């Protein structure tokens, strides 16, 4: 293999490794976000809420999957991160670190 072909192959491998690393990091961040929303959100914002005050998700907002969280990301940023209206009364004790994680995750979606 010529030195030019070798350099091209090495560059291609580095690019593939970088993309794979980014995908893995994104998956890990998604899992962290899901853990936060399971802890603080889905008792109300589930297809079948477990919170005794709700028979259906408030305002039909379901936050059980990454796809649903992505769809609601602008509202999550507003209600949870900026205005701190959610969780209601912060009954579940969401921390600033958890709010920061949600904000960083939402930034990756842009």
Please place each PLM-identified region on the residue numbering.
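Aromatic- and Gly/Pro-enriched helix-to-coil junctions and flexible linker segments
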Residues: 16-110
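Bacterial N-terminal signal peptides
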Residues: 7-17
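Membrane-interfacial entry segments at the cytosolic side of transmembrane helices
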Residues: 1-7
């Amino acid at each position: 293999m010529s030195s030019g072909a070798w350099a091209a192959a090495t560059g291609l491998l580095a690019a593939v490794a970088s993309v794979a690393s980014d995908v893995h990091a994104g998956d890990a961040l998604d899992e962290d976000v899901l853990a936060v929303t399971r802890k603080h959100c889905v008792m109300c914002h589930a297809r079948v809420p477990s919170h005794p005050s709700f028979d259906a998700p408030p305002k039909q907002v379901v936050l059980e999957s990454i796809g649903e969280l992505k769809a609601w990301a602008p509202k999550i940023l507003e209600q949870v991160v900026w205005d701190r209206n959610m969780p209601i009364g912060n009954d579940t004790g969401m921390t600033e670190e958890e709010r920061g994680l949600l904000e960083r995750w939402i930034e990756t979606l842009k």
